[in-house]
């Protein structure tokens, strides 16, 4: 009986150490992911993104999209504020039959500057309403600068399709593509985990 207990203890400690190593990897990757966005390193961002997304949209199309979003255009420009990396939280690592997955939450703040327009109060309220519907906490710094804060989450996936390396997808419940990439069990868990996380954030804020 004692021998069986020791065997179980060794197996359990091995599992916990492996899980801890995966969690550390996901934490490190999420920190790097935020750095890459800050530096506008689009190749680096794409290298960390789940290959199904890259196959769907093509690398050059994705780079063009990132440039349009993060480098702005004649209408607006977007700046990402330095993220608080100490606020990144990584979940336990879960498993389906073929896929390992986990979640990493982090705060992100963006500053949007409207280049050719000053928004009056009614337009500001309309913009804020749209951003709030997307889970943002928006406030206007002045009549052409909007600051938006959000608690974001990425889904980390590891299976044969990722070359058994951790790859990442931004969690957005309205993004239908996630349904074709993320296993059903993992998607349900992501929805539950994110909702619980947001509820805890609200409780801590009160």
Language-model features, listed with the residues they occupy:
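Second-shell loop/turn segments in exported
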Residues: 20, 31-32, 48-55, 142
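Low-complexity, intrinsically disordered terminal/linker segments enriched in charged
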Residues: 119-206
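Short, compositionally biased low-complexity segments
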Residues: 3, 35-44
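Short, low-complexity N-terminal intrinsically disordered segments enriched in polar/charged residues
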Residues: 18-35, 39
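Beta-strand elements of well-folded, non-transmembrane domains
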Residues: 108-114
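Bacterial Sec-dependent N-terminal signal peptides
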Residues: 1-24
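Short solvent-exposed beta->alpha transition segments
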Residues: 27, 43-101
